Amino acid sequence: MFSIFIDSDSLPKPHRAMVIRRILKDNQYIKACHFASDRVLPDVRDAIEHHTASLRAPLRDTLDKEELRKIRSNIYMYIVETGMNSADDKLVELSETPGFAITHDIPLASRLIEKGLVVLDDRGHELTKENIRARLSERNFMESLRQNGFVSEKTKSFDQRTINEFASAFDSLFNRFVKEFC
């Protein structure tokens, strides 16, 4: 079994929907899935409620209410204070191997890689010990250009191709973890 850690502040809703569908479909392989955000995410909350209900349903006639309440989803949503790196710090605190993370945040990816996790960004690129330094340097350089007014803050939008690339990379990584750890 393995865990998944999701920086859900920056993960687009279509991406979260894909991840949630796969987690619910193949939940038997997952120890825990952790979403960290500075706000309640209705889609994640609904997935937790739905999953908990589906786990309890077959046991309603055999267990009393107290025992049923102990049965809960292994999907967790952490609401952290709004502020710099609060969701990041929570994910780093929770992180454990074997596991992988999903984030757009390059400094967070670097911290998670140091803890032994594989990281996937929201465009479907796998970040590793081998490539994170270059990505971090590029990010820091672009940040300094933005701060000094040389470059305006523009991010490429998510088109269907980008969403498909993420979906394919997520499925491949998930399948790799199932083969390796389950």
Protein language model regions, located:
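Nuclease catalytic cores that cleave nucleic-acid phosphodiester bonds
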Residues: 2-182
